[in-house]
Amino acid sequence: NKMPNCLRLIVSGLSALFFLFPSLAAWAYGTDEYPSLWESDDSRLQKQLVATLSSLGLGKAVQNKKLSVAVVDITDLDRPRVAAVNGNQMLYAASLPKIAILLGAFVEIEEGSMALDSRTRESLTQMIRVSSNQEATRMLNRVGKERLLGILQSDKFHLYDPEVNGGLWVGKEYGKSAAFHRDPLHNLSHGATAMQVARFYYLLETGRLVGDNLSTEMKSMLGNPGINHKFVKGLADYPDAKIYRKSGSWRQWHADSALVETGDHKYIIVGLAEDVNGGAWLSHIIKPIHELMVPTKLAAVSH
C-alpha cells in the first residue's frame, strides 16, 4: 500500500527535523522508555522546595541566580518527580564536573579503549572520593580532552546541550594550566547546571550511561565519600542514609551533587552556589529536603 502524499510529506518533514536537530528527537521521545526530567515537574514538590529555601533565608539568592537547586524523587524510576530553582542556570562548579571525567573513562572502558585495572580503578576512586586534582588531570588526558567533550555533547548523552543552556563541561585540566576549551555559551572552564547533573545520576541509576556491571563500578566510586562537608555534613544525623556524591569548591563557588538512598526511597539532589557561605547553604538545605523526600519514621534521627 502506498502512503498518501500528505502523510509522506509529514513523515519526511519530521525525519528531516530530527536529523537536523537530534536533541529535539531526544527531547520529544527520550532515549528509551524513561521520561525526560524536563517533562517530569511535580507542582507539590516544587512548592515545597521553594518554601524550604525561603524558610532558610535563601529566597534572595535564588532570585539573584546565585543558587541553583534540583531535587528528583526517583523512588519509582519510571516516574521521577522533579523540582528545581534556576535548574538550567550554568555556574562554575569547580571539582563537581569530575563526574564527567568518570563517565568518559567508563565509556572508554566499555568500548575496550581503556582497561579497568587496579591502577585505573584507584585513580578514578581518588578523583571522586577525595577529589584528587592530580588523578583528575591524569584521567582527563587518558580519555582525551576533546574526546571527553565529544562524549558530553553526543546524541547518546546530551549532558552538554545548548537547547537547555549547557550542562556538564570540562575545558581545563585540574591544575595551573590554562583552559584548553571553554564552554561556548558561558566561557566556563569547569561548569554545570543542576538539571544536567541530576540527569547524570538518573542516567546512571537507570543503566543508561554504561552497562550494568560498569554502572555498579561507577556508583561504588561515588559512594563512601572521603570529604565531610556540604551534603555529607548535613546528612550526618541520618545514619541510614547512603550517599553517592561529588562536590566542588573554589573561592566563592560551592557545589554538591548526590544520589541519596534510605530504605526503599531514592532521590537526587544538586546544589550550585556562588557565595562565600555557599558551602554552609548546602549543608542546611539537605536536612529539610531529606525529610521531605523520606517518610518521617525513616528519616528520624537514630538514638
Tell where the protein language model's regions lie, with residue ranges:
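Bacterial N-terminal signal peptides that target proteins for export
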Residues: K2-L14
